Every structure is written in C-alpha cells, then in structure tokens.
UniProtKB/Swiss-Prot annotation:
Transmembrane segments: 20-40, 59-79, 83-103, 115-135, 137-157, 172-192, 220-240, 251-271, 285-305, 314-334, 342-362, 394-414, 431-451, 481-501
EC number, UniProt record: 7.1.1.-
UniProt function note: NDH-1 shuttles electrons from NADH, via FMN and iron-sulfur (Fe-S) centers, to quinones in the respiratory chain. The immediate electron acceptor for the enzyme in this species is believed to be ubiquinone. Couples the redox reaction to proton translocation (for every two electrons transferred, four hydrogen ions are translocated across the cytoplasmic membrane), and thus conserves the redox energy in a proton gradient.
Stated family: Belongs to the complex I subunit 2 family.
NCBIfam families: NDH_I_N
Summary of subunit composition and partner proteins: NDH-1 is composed of 14 different subunits. Subunits NuoA, H, J, K, L, M, N constitute the membrane sector of the complex.
Keywords from the named record: Cell inner membrane, Cell membrane, Membrane, NAD, Quinone, Translocase, Transmembrane, Transmembrane helix, Transport, Ubiquinone
Protein name as it appears in the record: NADH-quinone oxidoreductase subunit N
Gene Ontology MF terms in the entry: NADH dehydrogenase (ubiquinone) activity; NADH:ubiquinone reductase (non-electrogenic) activity; quinone binding
Lineage: Bacteria, Pseudomonadati, Thermodesulfobacteriota, Desulfovibrionia, Desulfovibrionales
Record gene name: nuoN
Membrane topology: Multi-pass membrane protein
Listed PANTHER family: NADH DEHYDROGENASE
Location relative to the cell: Cell inner membrane
Length: 505
C-alpha cells in the first residue's frame, strides 16, 4: 500500500527536473529576500549589496558545477540545460555580481533606493537566465519580458535626474515595439510549423521546405526578418540602435554597465539559439544578413563615438560597435564562431565593467552630480584630464581597460577579436574581416584619446578630486581587481578561457 502512495523521485518528473533550475531558484530566492529585507531592514544597505553578490556567486557556482554533456532538457524540453545556456549564463551572473559589488558607492552618492535597485537587478538576471535556457518560444518570450521590465524601472530609478526618466520612457517605448516584432515573428513560425518548441520548429520547417511548399519560404523569410529586428534592438545593432546612446547616457551608471553587458549577452544567446537551432535551413540567408548588420554596426558605432564629449555616451556607441564584432561569430554559422562570440562577451564583461567601475569611482569621490544636479563626475571626457597626476594607479587601471577595448595586444580584447576575425575569415567573410580591422583602428582614436587626456593634459579646476590610491570602497576595489585580472591574464594566457569555453561547446 505504501509503495503505491509514495512514488519514487524518478516518477515525479517536475521534481526530478528541479535541479536544472537551481541557479534560477537561487536568484528567485535572492530577489525575494532583498524585497523582504528592504521592507523590514531598510537601512541595511551594505547587507543588500553583499546578499546580491552572494546570490549571484552561488548561482554562478551551481551553473559551473552542472554537467552539460548531451544537452539535457527539463520540463518536457521547454528548458534546456546545455552548454550554450551555461556559457552565456555565466557571463550574465558574473555581470550581476560585479555590478552589485560596485553599486553601493554609487547608490549612496546618487541617493537611490537600494532595496528596489538590487531586487530589480536580481529579477532581471533571472529573466536572462530563463531566456538563455529557453527551449520553447513561449518561455523565451516570457524570459525576455522578465529581463526587460525590471530594466525599464532601473533606468528610471534615479528620480531626481530628468535624464533618467527620459531615458526610461525612450527605452520602454522602443523596447515594447521590438518585443512586438519578435512576438510577431515567433507567431509566424508557429503558424508555419504548429510548434513552439524551437528544435521541433527546425524539423517541421525542414519538412515543409523539402516538399517545395511555395508559401513556406516567403513566410519563413518574413519571420526571420522580424526575429532579427526584435533581437537586434536588444543587442543594439544598426539600424535598431537609436535608443542606446540616450538610454546609456541617461541611466544610472551602474545600470548602464549592467545592461550593456548582461542584457546584451543574454540577447546574443537567444539569437544564437533561435538561428542555429530553430532556423538552420535559412542559414545562407541569416548568415549573410548578420554579416551585413555587423559591418553597418561596426562602422556607425566607431565613427559616431569619435564625436562624443561624454565618456558614457562614447561607451554607448562603443557598445554598439562591439555588438558588431560579436555578430561576426554568429555570422560564421560554425561551432568555432559560437565559441568565439561566447569568449568575446566574457572578455567584454571584464573590460567594459572595469571601465564603468572607474567612472563610478570618480563619481563616488566627488560631490558633483549628487541628487541629479547635472552629470556625475567621471562622465565627461575632460574629467580625465591629468588623472595620472592625481591618481596614478587609477589611471593605469583605466589605461589597461582602454587598451583591451581597442584590441591592443597583449590584452584580452586582442585575443577576443582575433578569435572572432579568424572564425569569420574561415567562413568566407574576408572583406567583412578587413572592415572589422579598419573599425578597430578607428576605435583606437577615441579610446586612446582618453589616455591622452589622462597622461598628457593638465587637470581642470573643477576636476573630481581623487586620492593617489584606490581606497575606501571595498566593492569597487574587488571589481577593479577582478576585471583587471581578466583583461590582462586572458590576453597572456588565453588557453584558460578557451578551455572553459570548449567545455560547453
């Protein structure tokens, strides 16, 4: 009688699949605890910061400890615990942890409510992990919205700054439009295949195309265009980039750092899954389309960055350009290209978060911009004039990040671009690679322009005062140390990064 009542765990498929959701469950518990902690202990700001970082670290450890051989699925295939999900999920979780560590100083300076801030960031990362692991179109879309909605609120969280509210409105309107395009494209694919499972979509579409159905190919091409447009907005590729400069500049600096890395990485993972696993029959079309988008994105991002006087806005256009570089790996339509994209986004995590950490350090050390009274210290390029004389160590750290963003050896940025260029070249996109090399040369002008201000120009009278040592901010110190190590060591010893990437692909 007991045997018929108490079923073994293997007979309970929902419970048996829960371990695949372990990182997501940790993030969910962390977000809920942050909300409750802010309700009962609103003054424990440092605790909220370290709780967020700890939750991200535990979720990251669980992700790294999972066995992804064979591409396991859960909950009937709607959730995939495979290598693609793990590699990109690691970057999103690391971005959450690093952003949390450097947020307390900025939130204190900007007088932002930290309980909502950290919980929204945790919920957004939860959405990223869900969409990265989605094996079903419906789950993918739900994860995307769970990622986007908290970011809309995060962008507007600095209520005293009118730029923040303006950026949030722009981002919400453009994001809603892009989500509608993506949903429309997925609905067309569902109409063609009768399936929401991404892998099954590919099988049904292959059958329809093999029998020369005259209606299938045109409809599939339209769906492909809508999916590229919807996800192109999330990645900030040309011509879907128009929101990025204003939103990146107007959002709180920590939010800009988070969304420029984590949201971009999750969107690239979804783009890779939908194209490689859902639409492989259309690869001749979408690979050429991605190569064309990459060229436009690299050119516009780098050329527009030349004219900027705000470092945050310059980094916004730089993020657009880096999205173009990352597209080269997907355009290659090969396992090597996907590995190169994952490796590059991992490196981009270190060099971009590190650059924003320097901006936040200058902001925290200055009273300028407090309570939304104009731009924060560190946002304008002229704030970096004479930084080497005022804070030699901080200037040296920033110089490493600038070299890595440019792609100058022996930094990790060089190795990341080399892997992408090699994959694209092997796939037959030689001219595209030449354009990418030219664009990297253009980027040296504005990146090294910051270095020129730091080392070859005198400080302004109103330049933010900084000490000669990076002291007083434990979280920022940790972020700068981790990002500096990644930007340097992965350039000198790229085998360590390649070994980790090869484990998943």
């Amino acid at each position: 009688m007991t045997d018929t009542v108490i079923a073994p765990l293997s007979a309970l498929p929902l419970l048996a699949d829960l371990p695949a959701l372990a990182p997501e469950l940790v993030l969910l518990v962390t977000a809920v605890c942050l909300m409750l902690g802010d309700l009962f202990y609103p003054r424990e700001r440092v605790f909220q910061q370290w709780l967020t970082a700890a939750g991200a670290a535990v979720a990251l450890a669980l992700t790294l400890s999972m066995n992804f051989s064979g591409g396991a699925t859960a909950f009937g295939g709607v959730f995939r615990a495979d290598g693609l999900a793990a590699a990109f999920k690691v970057v999103c979780l690391a971005a959450l942890g690093l952003t949390a560590l450097m947020s307390e100083a900025f939130c204190r300076h900007a007088s932002m409510r930290q309980g909502e801030y950290y919980s929204l960031m945790a919920f957004s990362t939860l959405g990223m992990c869900v969409m990265v692991s989605a094996g079903d179109a419906i789950v993918l879309y739900l994860g995307l919205e769970l990622m986007a909605l908290p970011i809309y609120a995060l962008v507007a969280l600095r209520t005293a700054d009118p730029r923040s509210s303006e950026a949030a409105i722009k981002y919400f309107l453009m994001g809603s439009f892009a989500s509608a395009l993506l949903l429309f494209g997925l609905s067309i694919l569902y109409g063609l295949t009768g399936q929401t499972d991404i892998a099954e979509m590919a099988h049904r579409l292959a059958v329809s195309l093999s029998v020369s159905d005259m209606h299938t190919l045109p409809a599939a091409v339209v769906a492909l265009g809508l999916v590229l447009a919807g996800l192109g907005f999330k990645v900030a590729t040309v011509p879907f980039h128009v929101w990025a400069p204003d939103v990146y500049e107007g959002a709180p600096t920590t939010v800009t750092a988070f969304m420029s890395v984590a949201a971009k990485t999750a969107s690239f993972a979804v783009l890779g899954r939908v194209l490689l696993q859902g639409l492989p029959q259309l690869s001749p079309l979408w690979s050429d389309a991605l190569a064309g988008l990459a060229v436009l994105t690299m050119l516009l991002g780098n050329i527009a960055a030349l004219a900027q006087t705000s470092l945050k806005r310059m980094l916004a256009y730089s993020a657009i350009a880096h999205a173009g570089y990352a597209l080269l790996g997907l355009a290659a339509c090969t396992p090597e290209g996907l590995r190169a994209t994952a490796a590059y986004l991992t490196i981009y995590l270190c060099m971009n978060i590190g650059a924003f950490a320097v901006i936040i350090y200058l902001s925290a050390r200055s009273g300028r911009g407090r309570m939304g009274e104009g731009p924060d210290a560190g946002e304008d390029l002229d704030d970096y004039r004479g930084l080497a004389a005022r804070s030699p160590l901080l200037a040296a750290v920033m110089l490493v990040f600038l070299f890595s963003l440019t792609g100058i050896p022996p930094t990790a940025g060089f190795m990341g671009k080399f892997m992408l260029f090699r994959a694209a070249f092997a796939a037959g996109y030689q001219i595209t690679v030449v354009v990418a090399v030219v664009c990297s040369t253009i980027s040296a002008w504005y990146y090294l322009g910051v270095a020129k201000r730091m080392y070859m120009q005198d400080s302004q009278d109103d330049a933010p005062a900084t000490s000669c040592a990076i002291t007083g901010e434990t979280g920022l110190q940790a972020v700068l140390a981790v990002c500096l190590a990644g930007a340097v060591l992965w350039g000198i010893f790229p085998q360590s990064l390649l070994f980790w990437i090869n484990v998943y692909f």
